[in-house]
Amino acid sequence: GGMPISTRALQEGKYTSVDSYPQQIADLTGYLYDSLPANHRFAALHASPIIPTAPEIWLLGSSYDSARLAAEQGTAFGFAQFFGNADCEQALRIYREHFTPSMLNEKPHSLAAVLVVCADTEEEANQLALSTDLFFLSLSRGMLLPSFPSVRTAQNYPYTENDYAMIRN
């Protein structure tokens, strides 16, 4: 439920392509910073409650394209090292080199989001990491699991040599 304009804003683009991301970022920026043109389709939409500052906008991405998009839009950029195959250092270099100052940021702001498994011992950490390995292995095959599998499920999974090679890389 909600007001029709807010419902439309939240549902717009539910099934859109990556090509609409730049416009979605621009719309979100305009909305959060109250800078949408008067004739914009969401110009009448206002955040509630009203707060003195807008939240920072960070684009989380795992590719060179997302680094460039964040740079072009002037957003902060978080590189999802745990998720992508792109080189983190190169992605952040692309972001910094192509950064365009905006109402969001005068200079580039970036971070690397990495996957870390912590435990009391290395053996325990390796056991806990099994569920993450199986989750990302499944994802690489186009199967999005509803949640991370349990360690037991991961231990009992019938891995192939190819699976182990993918996990190591």
Question: Model-flagged regions — what are they?
Answer:
Residues 1, 56-60, 75-80, 108-115:
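Hydrophobic faces of well-ordered beta-strands that scaffold small-molecule active sites
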Residues 12-46, 87-169:
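An alpha-helical appendage that flanks or caps ligand/catalytic pockets
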Residues 2-13, 72-74:
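Acidic/polar active-site rim loop that often engages polyanionic ligands
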Residues 51-61, 116-119, 168-169:
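Active-site mouth loops of central-metabolism enzymes
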Residues 63-92, 96:
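A conserved active-site cap/scaffold subdomain adjacent to cofactor or substrate pockets
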Residues 2-5, 49, 66-68:
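Short, well-ordered, mixed-charge alpha-helical segments that flank or form enzyme active sites
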Residues 9-19, 54-57, 79-80:
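Flexible, glycine/proline-enriched loop segments at strand-loop-helix junctions
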